[in-house]
């Protein structure tokens, strides 16, 4: 079975109960299945908390965090440091052989600066699969933060959904975007089981899909088109359904290519 990229986000990273549920499901799945799994994560809530403590402003444009040069070290520490090693510690606690990485390790993704206006914010494209294949073949669980490195050697903050898309493209893997939302909702607040690009754009135009969810949906659409396969947006809150998700069943909203 092809690898599955699991993108983790939302408040899961700061929620012990949720982490326990997620890693319990992961542990149970790994004991009975051989499908290679890769975790890609952000950690916006941790960054927001740290910025507040440091009394630094949080500015977002089109769902992306503006990252000035004097803040990239702080954000790198939060994502590639605290968030990544927290997930690694949870993997270790549950007997999973985790390896903490960022997008720059082994050139997993090629990262370029988006614009001067956004600062150290990067766009990720597929990189080299060699390191991940080496780790997966040896039975490791890669845990990848969304911090990248440009060809000029600059640290870049990459949207975690987009980072996960690039890793999925690198491996030719399936992708699920796992967060604190159960999927995409229609205008009546009902969850959609699946959605096409045309329908998604209509919901954006109507103001039903907004802010960070636009970035999430666009990342899923881009991945679905590139991978030529559906991509799912789902919630980690339904721990009892996670094993089904890992097996390819729909528990959220499936984005059609």
Curated annotation (Swiss-Prot):
Binding annotation for substrate: 43-44, 65, 157
Record's subcellular location: Cytoplasm
Protein keywords: Amino-acid biosynthesis, Arginine biosynthesis, ATP-binding, Cytoplasm, Kinase, Nucleotide-binding, Transferase
GO molecular function: acetylglutamate kinase activity; ATP binding
Site (Transition state stabilizer): 7, 216
Keyword Kinase set for record: yes
Pfam families tied to this protein: AA_kinase (PF00696)
Pathway(s) served: Amino-acid biosynthesis; L-arginine biosynthesis; N(2)-acetyl-L-ornithine from L-glutamate: step 2/4
CDD domains reported for this sequence: AAK_NAGK-NC
GO CC, any one term: cytoplasm
SUPFAM superfamilies: Carbamate kinase-like
GO biological process, one term: L-arginine biosynthetic process
Assembly, per entry: Homodimer.
Similarity field: Belongs to the acetylglutamate kinase family. ArgB subfamily.
Name listed for the protein in its UniProt record: Acetylglutamate kinase
Organism listed in the record: Proteus mirabilis (strain HI4320)
Classification lineage: Bacteria, Pseudomonadati, Pseudomonadota, Gammaproteobacteria, Enterobacterales
């Amino acid at each position: 079975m092809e690898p599955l990229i699991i993108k983790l986000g939302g408040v899961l990273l700061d929620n012990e109960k949720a982490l326990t549920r997620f890693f319990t499901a992961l542990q149970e799945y790994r004991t009975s299945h051989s499908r290679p799994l890769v975790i890609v994560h952000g950690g916006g809530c941790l960054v927001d908390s740290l910025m507040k403590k440091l009394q630094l402003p949080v500015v977002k444009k089109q769902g992306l965090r503006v990252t000035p040069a004097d803040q990239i070290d702080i954000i790198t520490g939060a994502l590639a440091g605290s968030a990544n090693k927290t997930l690694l510690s949870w993997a270790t606690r549950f007997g999973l052989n985790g390896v903490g990485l960022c997008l720059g390790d082994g050139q997993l993704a090629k990262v370029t600066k988006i614009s001067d206006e956004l600062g150290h914010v990067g766009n990720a494209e597929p990189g080299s699969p060699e390191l991940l294949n080496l780790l997966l073949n040896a039975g490791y669980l890669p845990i990848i933060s969304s911090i990248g490195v440009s060809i000029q050697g600059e640290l870049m903050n990459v949207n975690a959904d987009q980072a996960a898309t690039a890793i999925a493209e690198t491996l030719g893997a399936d992708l699920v975007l796992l967060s604190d939302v159960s999927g995409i909702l229609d205008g009546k607040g009902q969850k959609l089981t699946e959605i096409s690009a045309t329908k998604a754009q209509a919901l954006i135009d109507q103001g039903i899909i907004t802010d960070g969810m636009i970035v999430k949906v666009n990342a899923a659409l881009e991945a679905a088109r590139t991978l030529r396969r559906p991509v799912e947006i789902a919630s980690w809150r339904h721990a009892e359904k996670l094993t089904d998700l890992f097996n390819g069943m729909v528990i959220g909203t499936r984005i059609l290519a």
